[in-house]
Curated annotation (Swiss-Prot):
Main location: membrane
Organism classification: Eukaryota, Viridiplantae, Streptophyta, Embryophyta, Tracheophyta
Residues annotated as glycosylated: N130, N148, N155, N220, N268, N276
Active site: D488
Homology family: Belongs to the protein kinase superfamily. Ser/Thr protein kinase family. CRK subfamily.
GO terms under cellular component: membrane; mitochondrion
Name of the protein in its database record: Cysteine-rich receptor-like protein kinase 21
Length: 690
């Protein structure tokens, strides 16, 4: 006798909710070169991406463009999950490609995994994409309690151990095609089994594939341990699991649908066309549909109101909002009501405070990298070996909280190789933490102003640092989606990576401009005295030319190896670095500025040209200062004739002479600002126009 076919109401309910609400947002590689719109690379990239869907479809779900030497070559890679139909694969590759181009404009390198049943990977770069184990980026996306299974502690423990055993089996089953799937029974769960697949990029070796999957197995402990449904991926591999079969990969292993809780053996049924359908099920399905629709409408209304309220706040404060990402890497946590707006508006990732606490060994003093007015910076390491720098806001500090919010809202959308990457943040009670990529060589001032370490900065390295900072500021001013003014450029806010390449850090004071906005005013003048231009100190007026002034001072410090504040009094007159260099120019002795640690083996014409550019940047009139795009051309094209600089701002006269600008300033309190991976011994000075 044929059994009545019953409907699992829980599965229907959660399927409707999930399919209506789960939307994945793209991610991009944090550091890459940038290209000009409609330029050679842009044209090649779009041509490559337009052909990628068909090539992936025609090559059994994986295709990598062959290497071609030469400039402006766009290399690409696409892969679809095993079991995806050819049409779904093609559509997925097309969708992800379009999303990446929209999300990462002018970015030469980007990568993203899609989500949903049609799981696929798209990656492109202006460099060779080789078959090495590339693990820089981690995705984790999952749906908690998709099937509404009750998780007691016993069940949760069983699920975790079963999941680990299943992943071990899957990894061991990986064959020459770099793919495997498996099923693991769950004795005490309504759904009885976990279904899982694992897959690697086909350009990996089998050994590297196994290593990549083993890392994912470990990653799961930090992001999604005990989660019933989800996927976790790195750049070269992914794992996916569910309590139901998916993609047609488990047809032979599918178990019977578990009985409905409403089926007690005596339910009323209606017979039609030879099929028995429970009357109670029909009523329940109708009720569930109404409830689901009501819930979704209420959620939509609530989200809409929250978004509008935040956008109003963002507009008033010069911030901007972006879409929320559901992907979460190591130790990240689901946003709660207190931080939901911050997470949704920044697109940044909220880390679990406990994960950061563990990574820094409970903020142990041996991991402390620096301390300032904002708080302390600690080195941390997650279980997978990823090193980070955690900036911890001092609990009683009122000064740091606005800067904290500003960095989360602003820096999360900035991606450039000469900017320090913000990985995420954590807010729990009074604890507020920013999590950055770890930069090993601390800040520029640790080398530049140290009598021993400064010898490591020869002229080619210093010139590379100047050029790298130029690229970073140019991105902020022109190439990012908004015009962003840093407002606190100085040696202690320039970090150096392992190859001594510069990365601009500390965006707590940064402001973004609206479209066509060229300048702004503020009643609260903040920054580091000596790097601030006269129009900002005196009138609170700032623009991109404010950063140009600070950059000019920084150029002169890099060449001279001396702080701007180290010039107190020369020959009876008050002085600073800018005044000192201007006098050297008038005396025809600019090379006297050069740091003796550089030695004699340097290009004198190149050094003089850089000093000249520095003086152009610190001119008193903002309109006379060159833009960062002009500065970049001056640095990289020696055929460009440099204009004659005008006298700089803050040109100090004899002590006996009055200084009109100084008389207009009312100095405020001075506090030290912290930054990623180093101690800033320069001070932040808050001054207000009198």
């Amino acid at each position: 006798m044929q059994k009545n076919k019953m409907v699992d109401l829980r599965a229907i309910f959660w399927f409707v909710v999930i399919s209506s609400c789960a939307v994945a947002a793209p991610t991009c590689i944090q550091r890459s070169d940038f290209f000009k719109a409609n330029g050679p690379y842009d044209i090649n990239l779009r041509a490559m991406l337009s052909s990628l869907p068909s090539r992936v479809k025609d090559n059994e779900g994986f295709y990598k463009t062959p290497f071609k030497p030469g400039p402006n070559i766009a290399h690409g890679l696409g892969m679809c999950s095993r079991g995806t139909t050819t049409q779904d694969c093609s559509d997925c590759i097309t969708s992800v490609s379009h999303t990446l181009l929209h999300t990462c404009p002018n970015q030469a390198e980007a990568i993203d995994w899609s989500s949903g049943d049609s799981l696929c990977l798209v990656r492109y770069s202006n460099h060779l994409i080789n078959g090495s184990l590339d693990e820089d980026i981690i995705w984790a996306e999952y749906i908690e309690y998709k099937y509404n299974t009750s998780f007691g502690q016993t069940n949760l423990t069983e699920f975790k151990s079963t999941w680990q055993a299943l992943m071990d089996r899957v990894i061991n089953k990986v064959d020459g095609s770099l793919y495997a799937n498996s099923i693991q029974e769950l004795g005490s769960f309504p759904f009885r089994s976990i279904y899982a697949i694992a897959q690697c990029n086909k350009d990996l070796t089998k050994l590297n594939c196994e290593k990549c999957l083993q890392h994912l197995r470990i990653d799961n402990r930090s992001c999604c341990r005990g989660i019933q449904v989800g996927y976790i991926a790195r750049t070269s591999c992914f794992m996916r699991w569910d309590l139901q079969p998916f993609l047609g990969l488990f047809i032979n292993g599918m178990l019977p649908t578990p009985p409905s809780e409403l089926d007690n053996g005596h339910s009323n049924t209606t017979k039609k066309d030879g099929k028995n359908i429970s009357t109670g099920s029909i009523v329940a399905i109708a009720v569930v549909s109404v409830v689901v629709s009501t819930v979704l409408l209420a959620l939509g209304y609530a989200v809409s109101r929250r978004r509008k309220a935040y956008q109003s706040f963002a507009s008033e404060n010069g911030y901007f909002s972006v879409s929320r990402r559901p992907r979460r890497p190591y130790g990240t946590a689901s946003p709660d009501d207190a931080t939901d707006d911050l997470t949704a508006s920044s697109g940044s990732l909220r880390f679990d405070f406990r994960a950061i606490k563990a990574a820094t060994s409970n903020f142990h003093k041996s991991n402390k990298l620096g301390h300032g007015g904002f708080g302390a910076v600690y080195k941390g390491m997650f279980p997978n070996g990823t090193e980070v720098a955690a900036k911890r806001l001092s609990k009683p500090s009122d000064q740091g909280e606005p800067e904290f919010k500003n960095e989360v809202l602003l820096v999360a959308r900035l991606q450039h190789k000469n900017l320090v990457g913000l990985l995420g943040f954590s807010v729990e009670g009074e604890e507020k933490i920013l999590v950055y990529e770890f930069v090993p060589n601390k800040s520029l001032d640790h080398f530049l102003f140290d009598p021993i370490k400064r010898v490591q900065l020869d002229w080619p390295r210093r010139h590379n640092i100047i050029e790298g900072i130029t690229r970073g500021i140019l991105y902020l001013h022109q190439d990012s989606r908004l015009t962003i003014i840093h407002r606190d450029l100085k040696a202690s806010n320039i970090l150096l990576d392992a190859e001594m390449n510069p990365k601009i850090a500390d965006f707590g004071l940064a402001r973004n401009f609206r479209v066509n906005q060229t300048e702004a005013n503020t009643g609260r003048v903040v920054g580091t005295f000596g790097y601030m231009p006269p129009e900002y100190v005196a009138n609170g007026q700032f623009s991109t030319k404010s950063d140009v002034y600070s950059f000019g001072v920084l150029i002169l410090e890099i060449i001279g190896g001396k702080k701007n504040s180290s010039f107190h009094q020369i020959d009876g007159s008050v002085s600073n670095l800018v005044t000192h260099v201007w006098r050297l120019r008038n005396n025809g002795s600019l090379l006297e500025l050069v740091d003796p640690a550089i030695g004699e083996n340097y290009d004198k014409d190149e050094v003089i040209r850089c000093i000249h550019i520095g003086l152009l940047c610190v001119q008193e009139n903002p309109d006379d200062r060159p833009s960062m795009s002009t500065i970049f051309r001056m640095l990289t094209n020696v055929s460009i004739t440099l204009p004659v600089p005008q006298p700089p701002g803050f040109f100090f006269r004899e002590r006996s002479e009055p200084n009109p600008l100084a008389e207009r300033l009312l100095p405020g309190p001075s506090t030290s600002m912290s930054f990623t991976c180093s101690v800033d011994d320069a001070s932040i000075t808050s001054v207000r126009p009198r």
